[in-house]
Amino acid sequence: MQVLGIDIGGTGIKAAPVDTTKGTLRTERVKVETPRPAKPDAVAAVVAQHVKNFEWTGPVGITFPGVVVNGVTMTAANLDSAWVGTDTRALFDKVTGASTALVNDADAAGLAEMKFGAGAGQQGTVLMLTFGTGIGSALFRDGILVPNTEFGHIEIRGRDAEKRASERAKELHDLSWGKWAGRVEEYLGHMEALTAPDLIIIGGGISRKADKFLPLLTSLRATVVPAAMQNDAGIVGAALYASLNAPAG
């Protein structure tokens, strides 16, 4: 099945057509900067631009950096508060003229990894964590997604974990790999206590530098591996989600 995948992030909105049977992009992905402020109408205009540029008339899968319930966005920590309570799927259907499916961004990345990447064929409990502007999470039990976990907002030392251990926190506080890895390990220790994962997959752009920090994570019981899909995970996962939730007929 061919689906247009669109990945909405705090800094950029990326899109590409996806072959959902192979988990591959059919063309080079196109990125447009996320509008400032990132209000619904402004972001929707970029989504519509992607659909128009690809001359797309089929199904569209779209990620969102927040909790999504039945197409309605309930949180939007790294965008704009105007999103809260918005029927975002209806908005995107309207501006694109397409049938859209909306999914949490980390859940989308997790779906891609579980189907085509580091989690393929893995049973038991798998925890996918994406480190970027914040920390996204996706939890799977025997391959089944438990949606909208938002574990990046677990409190560590009086602050959201993503304020201490995200990639943005590393850059903002100019942390060495060792210092940052210590914060990540503390966070992962909390996640082990809460979810007892068999496998932890580390995603986000920083997963490309896994050799800099994964060897420093020495106190964890679970196996910790870098994501295989890397920056394509959101786009592929969005498209995969849309294909799995396409209307019958």
Sequence positions of predicted segments:
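General beta-strand structural signal in soluble alpha/beta enzymes
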Residues: 100-105
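ATP-binding/phosphotransfer module of carbohydrate and carboxylate kinases, centering on a glycine-rich
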Residues: 1-60, 68-72, 92-98, 112-128, ...
